[in-house]
């Protein structure tokens, strides 16, 4: 099987009530996913990025058979998500986050046994599988504690174990490290990338809020905005597609907005992003463009002439975040 997931023209429309008019209620039509097309190769770790409301979670829900598409088709493991739902669910693991989906008054082990029985797993096989999963996610020593005593990171580990209870070859993850501290996030990324993908050969599709996480983990990435894909490829391919040669990060004191427009008018400059003021009153200007090395002196000179103090600057190659900002726009959260 070359492609584990195939999506063709997938569309989902929601109708929301806006208020009352003569003759009844007015319905606002929101196209959450608009004729989406992509494939996820077998054994691949595929990332889906985009602003809030772009359609990431809606896509995950359609692929997991929770939502029915209004148009288009998708297959998971060769099975249709609209015509072969039970076959899709048998080979698919779905891992979300947060506090829902677990029984807090049960132990971690008992939670996993409950979900194993939903898959009609024999108790002996389930116990062996649970022991293996608890070891995989690092919860063996706390397996018999009540979930209500777990930290958020431990609950997220249990979510991962729950989604893998039936050993699915294909796994969907919706923001698996959201809101976790850096140490816990790093541990979970290692579980996902090393243990699940590399060692067990699972196909993984995930959404994430963190650009650097996607850049370091994903084999390929699709950026979605307004329900449609605007860029897709490896992290390097996406960075190359927006033709951002380099970026310059300058830490400065307060500056007039006219400075930003003046810098953007310089040759080779594509975009200037102000990353906001810190508590000490300083700001960071991120300048994206081509051959910026020759612009350093003119930019510094411009800032000084406008009474702006330059505290530091750093030039580097563009990151996935730089490409994302160029494609989606400044201020578009993911």
What are these model-derived regions, one by one?
Residues 167:
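Conserved catalytic motifs of ABC-family nucleotide-binding domains
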Residues 160:
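Hydrophobic anchor residue at the start of the ABC signature
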Residues 191-290:
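ABC transporter nucleotide-binding domain
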Residues 171-175:
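Catalytic Walker B motif of ABC-type/P-loop ATPase nucleotide-binding domains
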Residues 113, 117, 124-142:
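Conserved ABC ATPase "signature" region
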């Amino acid at each position: 099987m070359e492609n584990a997931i195939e999506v063709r023209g997938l569309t989902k429309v929601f109708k929301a009530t806006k208020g009352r008019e003569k003759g009844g209620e007015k319905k606002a039509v929101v196209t959450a996913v608009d004729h989406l097309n992509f494939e996820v190769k077998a054994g691949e770790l595929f990332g889906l990025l985009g602003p809030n409301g772009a359609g990431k979670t809606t896509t995950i829900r359609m692929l997991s058979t929770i939502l029915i598409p209004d148009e288009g088709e998708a297959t998971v493991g060769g099975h249709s998500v609209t015509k072969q739902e039970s076959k899709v669910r048998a080979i698919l693991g779905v891992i979300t986050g947060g506090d829902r989906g677990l029984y807090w008054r049960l132990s971690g082990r008992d939670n996993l046994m409950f979900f194993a029985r939903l898959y009609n797993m024999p108790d002996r096989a389930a116990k062996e599988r649970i022991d293996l999963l608890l070891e995989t996610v690092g919860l063996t020593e706390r397996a018999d504690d009540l979930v209500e005593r777990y930290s958020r990171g431990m609950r997220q580990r249990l979510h991962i174990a729950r989604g893998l209870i039936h050993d699915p070859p294909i796994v969907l993850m919706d923001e698996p490290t959201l809101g976790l501290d850096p140490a816990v996030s790093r541990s979970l990324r290692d579980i996902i990338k090393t243990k699940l993908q590399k060692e067990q050969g699972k196909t993984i599709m995930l959404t994430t809020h963190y650009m650097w996480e996607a850049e370091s983990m994903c084999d390929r990435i699709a950026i979605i905005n307004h329900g449609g894909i605007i860029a897709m490829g490896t992290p390097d391919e996406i960075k190359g597609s927006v033709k951002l040669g380099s970026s310059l990060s300058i830490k400065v004191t307060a500056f007039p907005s006219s400075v930003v427009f003046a810098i953007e008018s310089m040759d080779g400059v594509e975009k200037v992003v102000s990353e906001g003021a810190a508590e000490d009153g300083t700001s960071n200007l991120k300048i994206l463009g081509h051959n910026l090395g020759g612009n350093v002196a003119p930019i510094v000179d411009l800032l000084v002439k406008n009474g702006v103090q330059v505290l530091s600057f750093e030039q580097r190659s563009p990151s996935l975040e730089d490409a994302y900002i160029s494609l989606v726009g400044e201020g578009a959260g993911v």
